[in-house]
Amino acid sequence: MKLLEDRINTDGQVLGQDILKVDRFLTHQVDYQLMKEIGKRFAQVYADAGVTKVVTIEASGIAPALYAAESLNVPMIFAKKAKNVTMNDDLLITEVYSFTKKLTSTVQISSKLIEEGDKVLIIDDFLANGQAALGLVHLMEQAKAEVVGLGMVIEKSFQDGRQKLLDQGMKLTSLARIEKFEDGKVIFAPADDIAFD
């Protein structure tokens, strides 16, 4: 998605060899207009997939997932990283490792929110090692829901997350694919949605 790549070039900050800071529009401050365009793009790509629910994990996946759900006219559900007192019913539970935070979190979704046979589009902010996405896939398997696709806002193609998801037979759409960081700049690989630009 050229609009997203341009924004990464303008406001993204490369930290070291493997971190991209995008807190000016995605991971801290949210540019709702950009998120709306991202949501529309995911909805375009998966328009014929029969999506019944959009699922993400808190926190930075919520904005793009919400706009994708709005464009598809379906509910959006986010997996919570901390159980609260109102989550006292049956839970779908798994553990995910965060590459950026360097920690493992237990994530959960109320089992009554995902029904057997639901066709789920998983959306997340970043794809690095694939752990968050695979964790959400595992939650959907527990619910006997079908994952019809995974939409990633930004993918670090130099890490192994993409291959892990493809090896699982998943349909993957990344709107910005980073081939590498070079001299503090982002070098992009062709995005999966290039036909829509």
Curated annotation (Swiss-Prot):
Function: Converts the preformed base xanthine, a product of nucleic acid breakdown, to xanthosine 5'-monophosphate (XMP), so it can be reused for RNA or DNA synthesis.
Catalytic reaction equation(s): XMP + diphosphate = xanthine + 5-phospho-alpha-D-ribose 1-diphosphate
Protein name (Swiss-Prot/TrEMBL): Xanthine phosphoribosyltransferase
Highest taxon in the source lineage: Bacteria
Pathway terms, separated by semicolons: Purine metabolism; XMP biosynthesis via salvage pathway; XMP from xanthine: step 1/1
InterPro entries, A to Z: PRibTrfase_dom (IPR000836), PRTase-like (IPR029057), Pur/Pyrimidine_PRTase (IPR050118), Xanthine_PRibTrfase (IPR010079)
Binding partners and assembly: Homodimer.
GO biological process: purine ribonucleoside salvage; xanthine metabolic process; XMP salvage
Compartments, record wording: Cytoplasm
EC number assigned by the record: 2.4.2.22
